[in-house]
Amino acid sequence: GTWSGHVSGEEIHPYEMNVAPASLFGMDRLLTGHTLLASLRGVPAYYFPAVEGEPNDLEAAENEGHNRAINRPKRTIESRIEVLDDARTSSRDELIRRLALRQTISAFHPDAQQRILDLEDPLLGIVRGEEPASVTVIANLGFDATNYVVEEPAFDLLSEQLVHGEVSVAPSEILWLSTADISS
């Protein structure tokens, strides 16, 4: 990686990690991160090789003589197809499905309101939009399943399941909860 710091002897901090996100985080966490990005206010921007789940390219780093090449693939369409395995393809397809779904939900308009919920670690909670069309985003950023209490019946737009009461949220799982048009 590349490091930055001051000559005065202050602590040195990483500037860039020089690692492919899929290799560092794994495909499940990468999909969660991309989905969180789509859940936030504004217009999400994605780095194509990360969406594709490109692994570290150790050969490129060695051949080019610098670490930055590890996550900057130069591929033809044919070689890109060879690199992508089923897990990466299904993760990419799931992200595309989620982004298409996002486009249909008014709460995810780039200018829609956003409020951060005060939840216990490792849960992250965000409310997007306004009632009755708001969406509550719940993400488990930890490594163990954790429980979240859904106060009123809601529909998880991602899993297409009705949820209510105490719900177990798996590691790297993200929920898009909507109460619009839900009858108890």
Go through the PLM ranges and name each one.
Residues 1-135, 143-145:
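Loop/helix patches that line or flank the sugar-binding groove of alpha-linked glycan CAZymes
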Residues 57-60, 148-150, 166-168:
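Short conserved micro-motifs at the rims of enzyme active sites and ligand-binding pockets
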Residues 140-141, 179:
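Residues immediately flanking
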Residues 141-153:
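Surface-exposed beta-strand/loop patches in extracellular or lumenal glycoproteins
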Residues 151-161:
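Solvent-exposed beta-hairpin/edge-strand motifs
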Residues 165-184:
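C-terminal beta-strand-rich structural cap/linker in extracellular carbohydrate-active enzymes
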